[in-house]
From Swiss-Prot:
Ca(2+) 2 binds at residues 201, 248, 251, 256. There are 73 peroxidase genes in A.thaliana. The lineage of its organism: Eukaryota, Viridiplantae, Streptophyta, Embryophyta, Tracheophyta. This is Peroxidase 63. Gene3D superfamilies: 1.10.520.10, Peroxidase, domain 2 (1.10.420.10). Glycans are attached at residues 217-218. Binds 1 heme b (iron(II)-protoporphyrin IX) group per subunit. Binds 2 calcium ions per subunit. It catalyses: 2 a phenolic donor + H2O2 = 2 a phenolic radical donor + 2 H2O. One of its GO terms (cellular component) is extracellular region. One of its GO terms (molecular function) is heme binding. It is found in: Secreted. It comes from Arabidopsis thaliana. The active site is at residue 72. Disulfide bonds join 41-122, 74-79, 128-324, 207-234.
Amino acid sequence: MAEQSQLKNLTIILLLLCLSFQSLSFAAESHLTVDFYSKSCPKFLDIIRETITNKQISTPTTAAAALRLFFHDCFPNGCDASVLVSSTAFNTAERDSSINLSLPGDGFDVVIRAKTALELACPNTVSCSDIIAVAVRDLLVTVGGPYYEISLGRRDSRTSKSSLVSDLLPLPSMQISKLIDQFSSRGFSVQEMVALSGAHTIGFSHCKEFTNRVNPNNSTGYNPRFAVALKKACSNSKNDPTISVFNDVMTPNKFDNMYFQNIPKGLGLLESDHGLFSDPRTRPFVELYARDQSRFFNDFAGAMQKLSLHGVLTGRRGEIRRRCDAIN
């Protein structure tokens, strides 16, 4: 009996030790750090920087395209590069969800270019989800935006399904209460939501996203002269759905606080833009960022850091794709 008791105790101890080692291993795999690639791919940041600089110079809309792509990847189910995966005969991927069909190709292209360069320098080492996170940060800096640290060590998802994102991304016509609920469900405050909305200070929107509101004689919040200009710019949009207008008509290629200065003047492009100023829960932050660019930059940087950590995969929960557009 004594021997059986000792054997039982020894078995329990060994089991606990195994569980402890597994927990430690998982914790080590799950840890994100800013210097994650310092030994495995020491030129990681230099390669990213060179790639995005060349792309931004040749195509100035790249920063806005990559920023939108990053949000559409992270916000629904986490920063796992699932939006980069192409559809197959057996699966409709996220990028082919109706809400993602208008994502500009330059955002995808800059990530693919960076991945190609990194695979030559450090094969099977850097995840696509880390590439897009750093590329977006560096692209924003090139157009005047704030610098912020990015923790690294993400893995890429092994799945990408259109059905998993359809109702999880904000729409241009969405009411503020619905927007607040969406952001809140992912742990973002009202102020963080407004700060992230400042991403509209660069980029463009297709006419179909706002033309139903363009009428110089109605009270949709547009400056009348702006409404006339929009109506003219989008006059042929039914025949050419690719026609678009800059989100910030004053400084469209510069990351600044002009977006927030425009909204009170009736120069916000989307219904959700107007809603930020008309709703008492969000208006104080619009006014704050309109008069204080430094505060906007600080809050935007913090919100982007938080977004970059949303739902990340680490260790054995994900993979490092050989190609960003295809699961291994």
